Amino acid sequence: MSPKRIAKRRSPPADAIPKSKKVKVSHRSHSTEPGLVLTLGQGDVGQLGLGENVMERKKPALVSIPEDVVQAEAGGMHTVCLSKSGQVYSFGCNDEGALGRDTSVEGSEMVPGKVELQEKVVQVSAGDSHTAALTDDGRVFLWGSFRDNNGVIGLLEPMKKSMVPVQVQLDVPVVKVASGNDHLVMLTADGDLYTLGCGEQGQLGRVPELFANRGGRQGLERLLVPKCVMLKSRGSRGHVRFQDAFCGAYFTFAISHEGHVYGFGLSNYHQLGTPGTESCFIPQNLTSFKNSTKSWVGFSGGQHHTVCMDSEGKAYSLGRAEYGRLGLGEGAEEKSIPTLISRLPAVSSVACGASVGYAVTKDGRVFAWGMGTNYQLGTGQDEDAWSPVEMMGKQLENRVVLSVSSGGQHTVLLVKDKEQS
């Protein structure tokens, strides 16, 4: 064997790996269609991005961002937008660093501002007080903090929040990021799930109940250092690999390569589709989603409810029913299995806020239901809607809706002008 071959076997230091070696990641969840950002609801900490004088909007309002946007995500009290060129803009509450940028100038958190990242970003996710950005070569940057019932637990290090982006140390490329209120799920190119953040309700899928409160004897590192969710696969060696993952506020859904739906975390209103209401600390293969004719393609979870969709464009809901958040009509009660929301046209995506639900239809309209208190439904009223209501407004005229995302008290839409025929 020539010495040249032997030399090649040694792995070079990470910083010596040439840029061209880096793999470009892709996943069906990456958005590429550019549009305009609209916000509505309550915005007293700037999460609407409409400046210091606008505290609420009962109808969608246009946010001024200097570039076309391909993804717009609502966190608990902040909003994150990804531009077509791979830049990240943020606005809203920055107390814990969720904006990832300096907002010392008064009012600068109330309007979109750019996050300093040298990398091209292909996907963002946002929680209550954290934000994640996935780069085109599969690295994840994170900023803000995670909290549990007792307050801040830190971000990547115990008790330390970060006001600027920091890279998550993982030696495998990530293809998708998803955020719950206080946890982050990363899906790798190999189909592994890495989780970090708060684990109190089981939402990390890898921390036993005994250690879920602040990590037990190992401390917060157990929660904040990303680790893989290991689940033995039946009948074969190795472990279950996943093709997709989604988060609710305190829970996680993951779809395996075989198409099975797994869930872990809070299910106190059956929002995971479990027969019981105990939290699940390890992934459960959810029998309520087993139906040979359906393949599940999208999930979104609020505080206590879930809205999901199948490959035929039908939307379903389960979990807590108060305030109409299931969209199943007046007087609907709690559901422990996915229940068809019958009054909707064919759907292309679904989303949940804390106590609201949304569906974007294949023809580019958006329907909303649930709690009306924060004006998140776009009806102009603060009454609850027990059935889906089509969202209307001046900014929606002659436009198609590309996506919707919803936080604690505000909602963000991505829209584009209808093509003139």
From Swiss-Prot:
GO CC entries: chromatin; chromosome; condensed nuclear chromosome; cytoplasm; nucleoplasm; nucleus; protein-containing complex
GO BP field: cell division; chromosome segregation; G1/S transition of mitotic cell cycle; mitotic nuclear membrane reassembly; mitotic spindle organization; regulation of mitotic cell cycle; regulation of mitotic nuclear division; regulation of mitotic spindle assembly
Positions carrying N-methylserine: S2
Phenotype when changing S2Q: Does not abolish N-terminal methylation
Post-translational modification: N-terminal methylation by METTL11A/NTM1 is required for binding double-stranded DNA and stable chromatin association. Di- and trimethylation produce a permanent positive charge on the amino group, which facilitates electrostatic binding to the phosphate groups on DNA, while inhibiting histone-binding. Methylated tail helps retain RCC1 on chromosomes during nucleotide exchange on Ran.
Effect of K4R: Strongly impairs N-terminal methylation and subcellular localization
Intervals of motif Bipartite nuclear localization signal: 4-24
Pfam families attached to this UniProt entry: WD40_RLD (PF25390)
Effect listed in the UniProt record for changing R9A: Decreases KPNA4 binding. Strongly decreases KPNA4 binding
Modified residues (Phosphoserine): S2, S11
UniProt region (Disordered), positions on chain: 1-36
Gene3D superfamilies in UniProt: Regulator of chromosome condensation 1/beta-lactamase-inhibitor protein II
Location in or out of the cell: Nucleus; Chromosome; Cytoplasm
PTM annotation (N,N,N-trimethylserine): residues: S2
Repeat positions for RCC1: 34-84, 85-136, 138-189, 191-257, 258-311, 312-362, 363-416
Residue stretches of biased makeup (Basic residues): 1-11, 19-29
Keywords of the record: Cell cycle, Cell division, Chromosome, Cytoplasm, DNA-binding, Guanine-nucleotide releasing factor, Methylation, Mitosis, Nucleus, Phosphoprotein, Repeat
Note in the entry: Patients with Raynaud disease produce antibodies that bind to RCC1.
Quaternary assembly: Interacts with RAN. Interacts with KPNA3. Interacts (via N-terminus and RCC1 repeats) with KPNA4. Interacts with ARRB2; the interaction is detected in the nucleus upon OR1D2 stimulation.
Function: Guanine-nucleotide releasing factor that promotes the exchange of Ran-bound GDP by GTP, and thereby plays an important role in RAN-mediated functions in nuclear import and mitosis. Contributes to the generation of high levels of chromosome-associated, GTP-bound RAN, which is important for mitotic spindle assembly and normal progress through mitosis. Via its role in maintaining high levels of GTP-bound RAN in the nucleus, contributes to the release of cargo proteins from importins after nuclear import. Involved in the regulation of onset of chromosome condensation in the S phase.
Listed name of the protein: Regulator of chromosome condensation
